[in-house]
Amino acid sequence: VVWNEKIFLNVADGDNLELWCLDRNNGQPLWKRFLSSGNHRERKQNMSSPSPVTDGRHVWVMTGTGFLRAFDFDGTEVWMRDIQADYGPFGLNWGYASSPLLYENALYVQVLHGMRTDDPSYLLRIDAAMGATVWRQERPTEALRESPDSYTTPALLQYDGVTEIVITGGDAVTGHDPETGQELWRADGLNP
């Protein structure tokens, strides 16, 4: 993600996952921060697939190993979460790759899985300043075989004064209330 003269990257460096802040003018690192160990390949991807997000003062980054961390623009860590420790292992066939969505001081993190787990898929709202979970909304699916898994990123939909968090995957598209997580609508049958 780029903000003014800074570029933020989620980087796999050997066994480690790191957040790099680069100078946009010359590509030189301004700082690097350790996120987690345990980088590995899941088929064709490593654990640095999710993109960082920023509001211009802070940067948040999720790893495929389940760590979600917040830093200020000087590289000082503000908070850290381990989503897998809190809610159970990710059960995706190809590894976790969804980026968080930042909207009005909240991060929306989706875990749509089912290939390697019987645990339900879910959407989280996390307070961006403190890192606490505000709510967790399960997202059921009737998807078969590999279809429960999704590597997409939540999207923001705004129309007629209404704001929704839209999730695609698990053979469905769903719209959710950003305040409560409640599913407002569902379009099924994406994988006949």
Language model: regions and residue ranges:
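Noncatalytic, solvent-exposed loop/strand surfaces
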Residues: 1-192
